[in-house]
Structure formats: structure tokens, C-alpha cells
Amino acid sequence: MSVKWNEYYQKVAQQPHRPNVERAANLLTLDNKTAIDAGCGTGRDSQYLLSRGYTVHAFDAHQDAVETCLTRFEGNPHYSISHSCFSDFTYPACSLFIASASLFFCPSEHFAKVWQKINKALVPNGVFCGDLLGINDSWVEADTHPNICAFTKEQVEALFEGYEILYFHERDEDGTTAVGHTKHWHTFSVTAIKR
């Protein structure tokens, strides 16, 4: 585990769940409440979903995140976590797929196959809630984050053919990271129902 991820996890460990996750959970009309929390980090979104009666299958590529969640959710029969990356995870059927700022780190050479797996796992009328990195983001050319995947707006829209997009927000501005570093953000936040 690198120092930068440890610092990030310490900064976000006590933060509440993301508002877009709550919005996505409220959109779900299916009786089956099964979620995948992809790149779950410290489990803040998983915690919220469990409180709403979901069964959560989570994964993260960083062992420290997995260990944090194993401790946090110890004994919860509705929670499972895997030490996996996007390309290695075995995707169960789900009604809600959460990828909060994690698909950024799916290597571009694996993304097409990963996206197929996500689409196959998400049942009809299931909800996707996640973020994709835009091509103007400063991480695209940075050595600090090799193997990231970035998209144009048109490419993101094409990914969601067969979905009803309910929320689409493009952020293209200077800002800071959770640990206070300045950077240029270019992201697409999407909430969509699979049709």
C-alpha cells in the first residue's frame, strides 16, 4: 500500500456516504436489493447500503482497504469483500452498481471487457451510479497514476446506450484532491437505469 492511498483512506474514513449513492438507491424499484461496491475504499457507501437493507458485494485492489472493511463489517452476513481489481472480480447479478471514482483506475486495455461484465451483472431496471475520468484531467498525463482510463463526453454517452440516464454531470475545473493536492478535475458522474 502506498503512502498516498493510506493518506487518502485516513482522510475519507469518517466521511458519510456520497449523496449520489443515496440518490441511486432511492431510484431502485426492484425488490432485489443487491449491490456491487466497486473500489469500495473504506466502505462508507457500503455502510449506507447495508443500512438500507442491501446485500453488498464489495471489492478493492488495495489490501488496506479490504482489511479496513473486513474489520468494519465483521460478522455482517449481508456483506462480502474481495481483494480484486476490476478485471479479476467475479461479478454477481446486482440491482445497483456503485463505482465512485474507482473506474478511473481500470486500465484502458481492460475497460471494454470490464464494461461488458458490469452490463451483464446489472439486471434490467438496475441502477448504475459512478464516475468516469475525462480526457482533460491532470491525472491522464501524470506519472503518479499510470494505467488509468479516460473518456470524451461522447464516449461516455455511448457507454450508456441501452440505459436511461437520469443524472449526468461533467466537471472540468481546477480543484483539490481529498488530501489537499491541487489538480485539474475532468470527470463524468452518471446515474442511469439499465433498460
For the regions a language model picked out, list residue spans one by one.
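Class I (Rossmann-like) S-adenosyl-L-methionine-dependent methyltransferase catalytic domain
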Residues: 1-30, 41-90, 109-113, 127-195
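Conserved acidic residues
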Residues: 33, 95
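Conserved beta-strand/loop positions that form the S-adenosyl-L-methionine
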Residues: 38
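A conserved beta-strand element that flanks and buttresses the S-adenosyl-L-methionine
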Residues: 98
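Short catalytic micro-motifs in class I SAM-dependent methyltransferases
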Residues: 101-102
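ABC ATPase nucleotide-binding domain "signature" loop
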Residues: 105
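A short glycine-rich, Lys/Arg-flanked "PGG" loop and its adjoining helix->strand segment in the class I
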Residues: 112-124
